Amino acid sequence: MQTLQTTSLRVSENQLFILDQQALPQEKRWLAADNVALLVDHIHALRVRGAPLIGLSASLLLALLAQRGLNRDALQQALETLRAARPTAVNLMNNLDRMKQALAREDYPQALEAEALRLVEEDKQLCDRIAEAGSALVKPGSRLLTHCNTGGLATAGVGTALGVIALAHRQGKVANVWVDETRPLLQGGRLTAWELGELGVPYQLITDSMAASLMAQGQVDAVWVGADRIAANGDVANKIGTYSLAVLAHYHQIPFYVAAPQTTLDRYCPNGAAIPIEQRAAAEVTGVAGSFGAVQWAPMGAAVYNPAFDVTPAGLVSGWVLDSGVVTPAQVAAGAFAPDNG
């Protein structure tokens, strides 16, 4: 396969490497991900994360395995194992559905490579279109609040919600970005803060519980988040804490926008209640660990509830910013995300 490089993925000498997002921002470390078990472990450990990026990494690995001579049955088994690696992120399923079609072809090694590379290029283009559509909604002098990480670290391109913010900044419309630290794994504090710093976008890091106070003071003009899955009725599964922000924004009459590619739509999922929510390890809540070290602050054996995602009802969303353009609440209510409109 040809050499390929994005912010977080690299293909070199027929091997897949991922940027270890658990080591950032203290260390920029690339890790091999050249077999299924290893990539699944990276996904579970969130060394590779972001719904679009997970789907792309799985697709690229399948293509590389085919280049190494794995037969169709072995590749099918690998595909199913990868498919189960992150149940909430529908981009993974959508990408692998396309790879499955390529696997059915007689020339499947070549077809898988072509499809994986096509998915990467499409993701870059989708991100650009999302940024263009979303930046038109950003008013000059805006103070924006964002949650988790939705930039180039999570996609092959400029990102989704963070891509919107970055383009709006280049257009001179962003006064400040409030970055939720995003407990418990601090993707905002570690990753989004790092990306915004690299892009030269002015930001201030806050704890998740500070958002309400800022909104009450009139310090937030809009909230921008990404999505891991969008149901047919417009409900949005995203990083835990997103629902809280949506409720706060609604109360304070602040626009709440969801930026995502159409590959994040699950038109056959009727509503948020049907979206599987991944439950994660207690250790993520009882302490913290990373390249900076490890510490535990909760009592040993403390009972923990740790869902990775929550669901924001469609009624709290001001607009869904897709690569096809901005979709309004009225359009969603009229069936814009229904199966027969796909």
Swiss-Prot record:
Active-site annotation: D228 (proton donor)
Pathway: Amino-acid biosynthesis; L-methionine biosynthesis via salvage pathway; L-methionine from S-methyl-5-thio-alpha-D-ribose 1-phosphate: step 1/6
Gene3D superfamilies linked: translation initiation factor eif-2b, domain 1 (1.20.120.420), Translation initiation factor eif-2b, domain 2 (3.40.50.10470)
Binding locations of substrate: R49, G50, A51, R86, Q187, N238, K239
Keywords: Amino-acid biosynthesis, Isomerase, Methionine biosynthesis
Cell membrane recorded as keyword: no
The protein's role, per its UniProt record: Catalyzes the interconversion of methylthioribose-1-phosphate (MTR-1-P) into methylthioribulose-1-phosphate (MTRu-1-P).
Name this protein carries in UniProt: Methylthioribose-1-phosphate isomerase
